[in-house]
Amino acid sequence: MKEDLRTIRISDLTLPELRGMSTAEPPGMRQQPMLILPNSFTFSYKAENFTACQHDILILIFEKLQGFMTTGCPLDKELCSEQKVTIDCSEIMDIRHKEHVIQAALGLRDLQFGFRYIRDELGNVNRVWGVFVTTVEDIRDTSFIRLTINRDIFPVLTYYGESVGGTFLLKGPALETKGRHTKTIRNMLISRKGIGQFQVELDEFKRMLGLSPQYRPSCLRKDILEPVRRWLLENSDIWFEYELIREKVPGRRARSNAIFIWIYSRDKDGKKKPS
């Protein structure tokens, strides 16, 4: 388990108080139901290693947790018993492929999480490690499965307040996006839409996409960046343009060491505009 754990503050906020809180939405988006994915979760994992089906399972899990979301103090993990979440597999794929969804859900039992929390006013910090999904239950003769979520991860799943932002997603487009790399890159774009552009080291970008450091930039462009860019341009309300930044090394060929991405979206009339 990596030591670069997130640090959040645990308070004595009770479960009834948390259930009564409303889910915040970004300005201008009041007419559409939003899902909030706290960045403490989405940026703490190699989400790019999830299959497309596992991406969709996580979307449906977060939909069930929206009533617990807070920009204030996180839920006291001692007050919440293990949380069971029921999801409809037919929202992900045809019911004939329910077994495929079950296998993807079983894979989430291997998803490890870790974070630090400040336990008192003196700033003393505890560290927590664990698994995300503990059990998967097949509700036979239906399209539903029931997942048990480890209660100790609730602070990470429900808090998007100070120092921890949140990525706002529309459920429909998130589920309709095809392919794990497309889903991962689309989430990157949405989480950074407010700044309109960003640059990241190429090795880090490869890690975010679940690729080895040896993955060639030419293959990255041909097999991932271009297909994803075209799919988003044709099918999504948000897409990107990019440039691979080449570093000149004396006595050697210039090599790509970073990627710069410009984020674009469509306004309500479908016109292209920079984000």
Where are these regions (language model features)?
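Charged, alpha-helix-forming regions
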Residues: 2-275
